[in-house]
């Protein structure tokens, strides 16, 4: 079914809860999906443009060839979620949590990372440019029960090198 995700968003007109759904080849623009829950969902070739996902949750989801542009992902939780060939551009990830997430061939550009928490990541061929950090609320990176606080790009990339896989 074409534009299934857009149809669901229009019908519900508020926070949505989705389980075991698959979406492809859609553009979602100027929507507020705050407090939504996505479980075991697959997103292929989806463009999220100026979408508010504040306080939403993605658990065991897969994103492939997706673009997340100019969007608000503050305090969003991503658990056991994978991103392959995706692009995050001009996105606010402040206060968000990525646990057991996997990034492969993904780009991050012009990203706000205030208070972001990263835990047990797997990263492959992923690039980071124009990231904004905070010394007051640094990025916290967890690995094997050790926590590192990061407030600049050099230390961020140095620590993330430990998460790269072949």
Regions found by a protein language model. Name each.
Residues 1-166:
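Tandem repeat scaffolds
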């Amino acid at each position: 079914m074409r534009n299934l995700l857009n149809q669901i968003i229009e019908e519900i007109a508020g926070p949505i809860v989705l389980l075991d759904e698959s979406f492809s080849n859609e553009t979602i623009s100027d929507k507020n999906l705050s407090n939504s829950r996505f479980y075991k969902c697959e997103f292929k070739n989806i463009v999220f443009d100026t979408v508010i996902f504040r306080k939403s949750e993605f658990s065991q989801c897969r994103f492939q060839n997706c673009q997340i542009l100019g969007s608000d992902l503050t305090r969003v939780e991503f658990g056991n979620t994978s991103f392959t060939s995706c692009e995050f551009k001009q996105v606010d990830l402040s206060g968000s949590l990525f646990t057991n997430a996997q990034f492969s061939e993904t780009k991050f550009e012009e990203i706000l990372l205030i208070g972001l928490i990263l835990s047990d990541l797997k990263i492959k061929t992923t690039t980071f440019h124009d990231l904004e950090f905070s010394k007051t609320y640094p990025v916290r990176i967890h690995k094997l029960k050790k926590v590192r606080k990061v407030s600049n790009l050099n230390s961020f990339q140095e620590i993330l090198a430990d998460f790269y896989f072949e």
